[in-house]
Amino acid sequence: MVESGIHDTLCRAIIALFIPVNIKGEFNTSFKKLENLTRPFVNYFILPLFVFMNSGILLEYFAFKGICSNSILALIYGIIFGLFVGKQLGIMLFSYPFVKFKLCNLPSDTSWLKFYSIAILGGIGFTLSLFIGSILRLRAAALQTL
């Protein structure tokens, strides 16, 4: 797929769609064990690292003794606040009044903490859409030079 011009990250996402979900037998239990073993590592390390690396922050701006300049520091904090904190706050601050004024309801088995986790996913999803958009812009620019 990579030779066809599709980015390797998108190739892996497409391949992941073909991972079997409902399998009967011994393979199912071993696959579930592997999934349960790796889930915390993936959820709390790999996915946040992936989102951070694709958020547009260049690690060359970081130094062991601090950050190079105040303008770069402001840029980095702006990106972090906008991509991560801003999406969560926006979703929560927009949804809370609707539930409070009974314009809509949370599902019966949903708490505000669970809803907040969905708000986090909303921020991550937007960041991933920016990543995919940047891949497409790079591909379009490369095709125009041919």
From Swiss-Prot:
GO cellular component terms listed in the entry, alphabetical order: plasma membrane
One of the GO biological process terms: regulation of pH
Gene Ontology MF terms: sodium:proton antiporter activity
Location of the protein in the cell: Cell inner membrane
Keywords: Cell inner membrane, Cell membrane, Membrane, Transmembrane, Transmembrane helix
Primary subcellular site in the record, as a coarse category: membrane
InterPro entries: Na/H_antiporter_dom_sf, NhaA
Keyword Plastid tagged: no
UniProt topology in membrane: Multi-pass membrane protein
Membrane-crossing segments per the record: 44-64, 72-92, 115-135
Family indicated by similarity: Belongs to the NhaA Na(+)/H(+) (TC 2.A.33) antiporter family.
PANTHER family, A to Z: NA(+)_H(+) ANTIPORTER NHAA (PTHR30341:SF0), SODIUM ION/PROTON ANTIPORTER NHAA-RELATED (PTHR30341)
Protein name as it appears in the record: Putative Na(+)/H(+) antiporter NhaA homolog
Naturally occurring in which organism (per UniProt): Rickettsia conorii (strain ATCC VR-613 / Malish 7)
